[in-house]
């Protein structure tokens, strides 16, 4: 069994960002167990689709770094009232995307190839606007990388193919998304 763990990556990202305050409990403030399981499944989807372990690790590592950085900015009240409106718009759009992803999974023959990529691109643009003044161009590149990677229509078509090899991962991802929604975290 492979030793990849999104929690370990989250801890590495947190250590780099928060250097003196890095601890496993601090990572858990940003990435809970359910989110970690979803990230692990996203990694498996990416790895199976791209056949590239290092690229798949990099995209998840970038996702974790961005999530932790935004969490740090939010916890330290770095966002202006206008940016908080953008954050709420992003959260709403992300929630909409999760609900759409779940619906496509639960209701046969409803998957539409262009819908999720469009939602993900809207999320990406909102997030880039939110962090424009707070994060470096390198972090902006990470955001681009993550959203562009998971908005790949061909990957999504394979993911939503009930007879495909990625389908079991989709089941776990949607189960996790449902749990986050039920808990009010997404």
UniProtKB/Swiss-Prot annotation:
<dbReference type="InterPro" id="IPR008477">
    <property type="entry name" value="TNFAIP8-like"/>
</dbReference>
<comment type="similarity">
    <text>Belongs to the TNFAIP8 family. TNFAIP8L2 subfamily.</text>
</comment>
<dbReference type="Pfam" id="PF05527">
    <property type="entry name" value="DUF758"/>
</dbReference>
<keyword id="KW-0391">Immunity</keyword>
<comment type="function">
    <text>Acts as a negative regulator of innate and adaptive immunity by maintaining immune homeostasis. Negative regulator of Toll-like receptor and T-cell receptor function. Prevents hyperresponsiveness of the immune system and maintains immune homeostasis. Inhibits jun/ap1 and NF-kappa-B activation. Promotes Fas-induced apoptosis.</text>
</comment>
<keyword id="KW-0399">Innate immunity</keyword>
<protein>
    <recommendedName>
        <fullName>Tumor necrosis factor alpha-induced protein 8-like protein 2</fullName>
    </recommendedName>
</protein>
<dbReference type="InterPro" id="IPR038355">
    <property type="entry name" value="TNFAIP8_sf"/>
</dbReference>
<dbReference type="GO" id="GO:0045087">
    <property type="term" value="P:innate immune response"/>
</dbReference>
<dbReference type="GO" id="GO:0042981">
    <property type="term" value="P:regulation of apoptotic process"/>
</dbReference>
């Amino acid at each position: 069994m492979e030793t990849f763990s999104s929690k370990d990556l989250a801890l590495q990202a947190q250590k780099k960002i928060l250097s003196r305050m890095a601890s496993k409990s601090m990572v858990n403030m940003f990435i809970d167990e359910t989110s970690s399981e979803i990230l692990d499944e996203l990694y498996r989807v990416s790895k199976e689709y791209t056949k590239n372990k290092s690229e798949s690790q990099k995209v998840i590592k970038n996702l974790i770094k961005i999530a932790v950085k935004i969490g740090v900015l939010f916890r330290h009240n770095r966002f202006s009232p206008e940016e908080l409106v953008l954050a709420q718009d992003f959260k709403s759009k992300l929630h909409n995307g999760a609900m759409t992803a779940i619906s496509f999974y639960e209701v046969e023959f409803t998957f539409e190839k262009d819908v999720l990529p469009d939602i993900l691109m809207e999320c990406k643009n909102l997030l880039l606007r939110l962090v424009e003044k707070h994060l470096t161009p390198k972090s902006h590149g990470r955001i681009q990388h993550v959203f562009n990677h998971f908005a790949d229509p061909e990957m999504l078509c394979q993911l939503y193919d009930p007879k495909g090899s990625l389908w079991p991962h989709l089941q776990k991802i949607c189960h996790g998304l449902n749990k986050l929604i039920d808990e009010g975290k997404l």
